[in-house]
UniProtKB/Swiss-Prot annotation:
Organism: Mus musculus
Record-listed N-acetylalanine modification sites: A2
The keyword Nucleotide-binding appears for this protein: no
Protein name, UniProt field: GRIP1-associated protein 1
Compositionally biased region (Low complexity): 647-659
GO CC annotations on file: axon; dendrite; early endosome membrane; glutamatergic synapse; recycling endosome membrane; Schaffer collateral - CA1 synapse
Annotated Polar residues bias: 617-635
Any coiled-coil regions, as ranges: 4-158, 204-606, 666-700, 750-779
Post-translational modification (record): Proteolytically cleaved by caspase-3. A minor C-terminal proteolytic fragment of 30 kDa is produced. Proteolytic cleavage is required for JNK signaling activation.
Subcellular location: Early endosome membrane; Recycling endosome membrane; Cell projection, Axon; Cell projection, Dendrite
Gene Ontology annotations of biological process type: protein transport; regulation of neurotransmitter receptor transport, endosome to postsynaptic membrane
């Protein structure tokens, strides 16, 4: 019994599972049909969108602003209805999925319990103990019954003592068979009692289990109701959270757009800054070139001035040497002449000759001193040249420093100018002092020369005057003494000049050391500043390179997006041409139907026209075909969607499969690849969200299409009922066909003809108003679906851009 019941429950569960699977398959089929209907509705929406644009133009030309406001309010109302329908569908879908998942889990649990009951693995010991307990209880009750029966039987046997007494003389072998004969029957009865009691106990346990199971099922149903209520509440909270999430998503998207705008502004500012830095660098290079030219010109001028000074010094030296040579030659010739005259003189003049020789020796010493002074002057000029060279070197160093430090402050330039002026003043002072000393030496030399000439003249006079020779000798001695004093004065003067020169050299060396130290410190500072400036320039160059790279990447992305947009425009233009062609055909068909309807309404006597109209209305594709094959345009648009899907599937496979991707170029770094993958994930997430929205819109459009079909069926039944009522009121019983009914309705001179026309006019007016409302609904849906289709079509393009760019 337990196994039979478990198998029945298992079969019932299997049937429930099969029903759920069939429902799932039906829902999937309905979803597929809804997708096909959505494709057809998209085509209709595109067509209605075109019609709406034309109608809007006509409205803008013909109608007033109030009617436009009414239409806009109705449009907003329909949008609100559409959103409410979407939310209802979401709630229903979520509840159905939750119930389905719960039922699946319950089915799995019940299958597991059934399997455990069949196998008996987990509770084998417990089941064995329960079976033994039942068997022992049944055996106990059976034994008790047997004991009672035996007691009754033995009581009856004790009442019959005579039978027992007669049997005492018999041998014991005859007494034993009487109790042994009923033993198998008692055992069978005992077993039968045991089995019966065991079955009773099992039946009681089974009833208890069924009652407990019913209580448990009722409890589970109550819990299911509570859970469904909780699920509804959670669904409502989920809808609220979904709306909040959408608002947050919109806010985040706006923030991202603001950040992108800020980034573009920062890029523009960086570009402007780099341009300014380039302009400043070019201006600095130009100023450096100008300063180099100026320093080169100054250097050339200094070199020319130095050469001119050297030429002047050389000419002065040569002139002085020539004059001294001439003077010495003249003096030597005169002395020789005088010596010849002195030799011709008497022996008295020997002393005078010796004195003259001494004077000549003194003159030679003076000449040697003059030569030494000239050598010292040359040394001084050489020192002056060395000082000038050092000054020029210093100027060159200062010029180089000035060229490297053009962008420094004006204070440092003024300090450098002050140092230069001080140095030039020192050089000018040293030069003036040297020139003054040279002039003094020249004056001393001239005075000495004049004195010597005067002495020579005096000697000539003394030679002429032989009489006053002694006086002249005395005068010469006095002159010799005076010359000795002049010699001492000259020696002292030379010592003072040497000491002053040594002091000046020491001072100049000290000043040169100080200047060198200052220049070394300044050079170190300038080198550090120059290194900092170079580092800044290098950083600016790196930033510029980075900006250039980002600009090139952005340009490439813009180019890729433009190419994708062109491709989409081409596809859209092809679809648009097809839709235009279909629109033209539909318009022609509508015009023909309108003409026929007008002919029927105007010509009330033409029966064939009305019959053809009704037959064409009954046999029209809009009556016979609904859903995915409502018109030719739906078929063409469905084919286009299939082509798009077939073209999108290899593109997705190319973008998703890592083996089919082309090798990554060497220019892309790991960070750029990570950014591309992140962008790909974001675009895929956006695409999935848009696909969900499109699915919801497809479901809502499918429901609207079903409403349209129902309304069209209601209109058909209304038309048919009205015609049947009219035919019954006229008393016609011939209902064999629609042609006979129409011929009865359109009899000439019939009174119901006007009522028929009025009903047809009312029906047409109602149909036109309904068509206008549906037009508006379809226009709203077309705008939404076109926007979503553009987003869905545009979202995979960024996924493929890196591959195309590679």
């Amino acid at each position: 019994m337990a196994q039979a019941l478990s198998e029945e429950e298992f079969q019932r569960m299997q049937t429930q599972l099969l029903e759920l699977r069939t429902n799932n398959y039906q829902l999937s089929d309905e979803l597929r049909k809804n997708g096909v209907e959505l494709s057809s509705l998209r085509q209709k929406v595109a067509y209605l969108d075109k019609e709406f644009s034309k109608a809007q133009k006509a409205l803008s030309k013909s109608k007033k602003a109030q009617e436009v406001e009414v239409l806009l309010s109705e449009n907003e109302m329909l949008q609100a209805k559409l959103h409410s329908q979407e939310e209802d569908f979401r709630l229903q879908n979520s509840t159905l999925m939750a119930e389905f998942s719960k039922l699946c889990s319950q089915l799995e649990q019940l299958e597991l319990e059934n399997r455990q009951l069949k196998e008996g693995v987990p509770g084998a010991a417990g089941a064995h103990v329960d079976g033994e307990l039942l068997r022992l209880q049944a055996e106990n009750t059976a034994l008790q019954k047997n004991m009672a029966a035996l007691q009754e039987r033995y009581g009856k046997e004790a009442v019959r003592p005579s039978a027992v007494g007669e049997g005492q003389g018999d041998p014991p072998g005859d007494v034993l068979p009487t109790p042994l004969a009923p033993m198998p029957l008692a055992e069978v009865e005992l077993k039968w009692e045991m089995e019966r009691e065991e079955k009773k106990l099992l039946w009681e346990q089974l009833q208890g289990l069924e009652s407990s199971k019913q209580a448990e099922t009722s409890r589970l149903q109550e819990e299911l109701a509570k859970l469904s209520e909780k699920l509804k509440k959670k669904q409502e909270s989920f809808c609220r959270l979904q709306t909040e999430k959408e608002t947050l998503f919109n806010d985040s998207r706006n923030k991202i757009e603001e950040l992108q705008q800020r980034k573009e502004a920062d890029l523009k500012a960086q570009l402007a800054r780099t341009q300014k830095l380039q302009q400043e660098l070019e201006a600095a290079n130009q100023s450096l070139a100008e300063l180099r030219d100026q320093r080169q010109g100054e250097r050339l001028e200094h070199a020319a001035a130095l050469r001119a000074l050297q030429d002047q010094i050389q000419t002065a030296k040569t002139q002085e040497l020539n004059m001294l040579r001439e003077q010495t030659s003249e003096l030597a010739s005169e002395l020789q002449h005088r010596q010849a005259e002195y030799e011709e003189l008497m022996g008295q003049k020997d002393d005078l000759n010796s004195q003259l020789q001494e004077s000549l020796r003194a003159n030679s010493r003076l000449l040697e001193q003059l030569q030494e002074i000239g050598q010292e002057k040359e040394q001084l000029t050489q020192d002056l040249q060395e000082a000038r060279k050092s000054a020029e070197k210093r100027k060159v160093m200062l010029d180089e420093l000035a060229m490297e430090t053009l962008q420094e402050k004006s204070q440092h330039k003024e300090e450098l100018g002050a140092v230069r002026l001080r140095h030039e003043k020192e050089l000018l002072g040293v030069r003036a002092r040297y020139e003054r000393e040279l002039r003094e030496l020249h004056e001393d030399k001239k005075r000495q020369e004049e004195e010597l000439r005067g002495q020579i003249r005096e000697e000539k006079a003394r030679t002429r005057e032989l009489e006053n020779l002694q006086h002249t000798v005395e005068e010469l001695q006095a002159q010799v003494h005076s010359m000795d004093g002049a010699k001492g004065w000259f020696e002292r003067r030379l010592k003072e000049a040497e000491e002053s020169l040594q002091q000046q050299q020491q001072e100049q060396e000290e000043t040169l050391k100080l200047c060198r130290e200052e220049h070394a410190a300044e050079l170190k500072g300038k080198d550090e500043e120059l290194q900092n400036v170079r580092e800044q320039l290098q950083q600016a160059q790196e930033e510029r390179d980075g900006h250039v790279k980002t600009i090139s990447n952005l340009k490439q992305e813009v180019k890729d997006t433009v190419d994708g947009q062109r491709i989409l425009e081409k596809k859209g233009s092809a679809v648009l041409k097809d839709l235009k062609r279909q629109l033209h055909l539909e318009r022609k068909r509508a015009d023909k139907l309108q003409e026929r309807l007008q002919e029927i309404l105007t010509n009330s006597k033409s029966r064939t026209g009305l019959e053809e109209l009704v037959l064409s209305e009954m046999n029209s594709p809009s009556r016979t075909q609904t859903g995915d094959s409502s018109s030719v345009s739906s078929f063409s648009y469905r084919e286009i969607l299939k082509e798009k899907e077939s073209s999108a599937i290899p593109a997705r496979s190319l973008s998703s499969s890592p083996q089919a991707q082309p090798p990554r170029p060497a220019e892309l770094s790991d960070e750029e690849v990570a950014e591309l993958f992140q962008r790909l994930a974001e675009t895929q997430q956006e695409k999935w969200m848009l696909e969900e929205k499109v699915k919801h819109l497809e479901v809502s459009s499918a429901s609207m299409a079903e409403d349209l079909c129902r309304k069209s069926a209601i209109i058909e039944t209304y038309v048919m009922d009205s015609r049947i009522d009219v035919s019954v009121a006229a008393g016609h019983t011939d209902r064999s066909g629609l042609g006979s009914v129409l011929r009865d309705l359109v009899k000439p001179g019939d009174e119901n003809l006007r009522e028929m026309n009025k009903k047809l006019q009312n029906m047409l007016e109602e149909q036109l108003t309904k068509n206008m409302h549906l037009h508006k609904d379809m226009e709203v849906l077309s705008q939404e679906i076109v926007r979503l289709s553009k987003e869905c079509v545009g979202s995979p393009d960024p996924d493929l851009e890196p591959g195309e760019a590679n």
